């Protein structure tokens, strides 16, 4: 058995709750205050912290500057805006260039999740109870997304590969996703200098919604059964929780943007990126991560996301939003025995 494992953030709470003796609490062993707080919360169960945050899932709006220029727009037009304004700008881009503004796999509820976290809410309430049909933010997210699809502002790609292709071929003007999508964006060298990144739209009708969110990411965990647990913790303290040199090394090679906040002030993170026309994009994203609202994904996050994906499909096919969310809530409650 390994001493340290890497786990997806959205699965952490479920696995910790299911196997409470399998993982070593890291409270008092690692200074978790040095990490983006929203990431620390993903691994917190019953008041104890079990995860050391690693790669960043902070979202950004990534845009083709040449396409925007055709529409008479600049990346600055998309910074600190609402989703309603995003739709207005999408109409301009569509009218002037014929291209959708963004895309997303048609079987994915990632857009909904991004919007939800920006408002600091999720599919479960603070007590872990299913919170779908009466969730005002979720209703608004469904309305916004279905409107973007209906108006051709968001292209529903057939699958993940098709989604990536829309970005890399220039079929759309950009994408909104976790910062790990940079790896797919920069895989087309001839597009260097034609990209920019700004923050994520917020929900106008939700005062608590901000221009920052997350999608994806993972964290390190130490197995409680490890015979070298102290050594494992010491290793993490000297690397992912204590070494700007480490982050400086892995960033250029893998594009893995950390959530250890001190790394954001290193020269490598603050280096202007040619692919993004000189923008200090990594530094900007670390700044976004520090402002992401905290949410608790809960034990049954995957069950909820699957139900929401089905509800989204039904809504796009014409079903009433409330009815679709009612069905989703009933499905989740049945699955988890609530």
Q: Locations of the language-model features?
A:
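Hinge/lid segment of periplasmic solute-binding proteins
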Residues: 8-60, 85-87, 114, 196-199, ...
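Short helix-initiation/N-cap motifs at beta->coil->alpha
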Residues: 81-87, 155-169
